[in-house]
Amino acid sequence: MTALVLAGFLGAAIIIVAFFANQQGWLASADWRFPAANLLGSVLMMGSLLVQWNAPSVAIEGFWMAISAYGLVRSLRA
């Protein structure tokens, strides 16, 4: 398993933990850390897709990154 694939698993774990924390009420979606975690996770997952290409996954991760970046900017401006 390459470092990029491991990074992809780490990215998935970050996204899952952020989502779980949000569902538990521990991390509000308006908190800058929520979109930051989603952005970091999706960047790491995108890196793993360089090794194991999957066009639909690249598409969803691209949108996930863009929406997370937008949410992070909004959170930091508030």
What are these regions (language model features)?
Residues 30-38:
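Cytoplasmic-side transmembrane-helix entry/capping segments in multi-pass membrane proteins
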Residues 17-28, 69-78:
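C-terminal ends of transmembrane helices
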Residues 40-46:
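Hydrophobic, membrane-inserted alpha-helices
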Residues 53-78:
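C-terminal structural segments of small proteins and small subunits
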Residues 16, 42, 65-68:
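Small-residue-rich packing faces within the transmembrane alpha-helices of Major Facilitator Superfamily
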Residues 1-2, 24-28, 50-55:
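Membrane-interface helix caps and helix-loop-helix hairpins in membrane proteins
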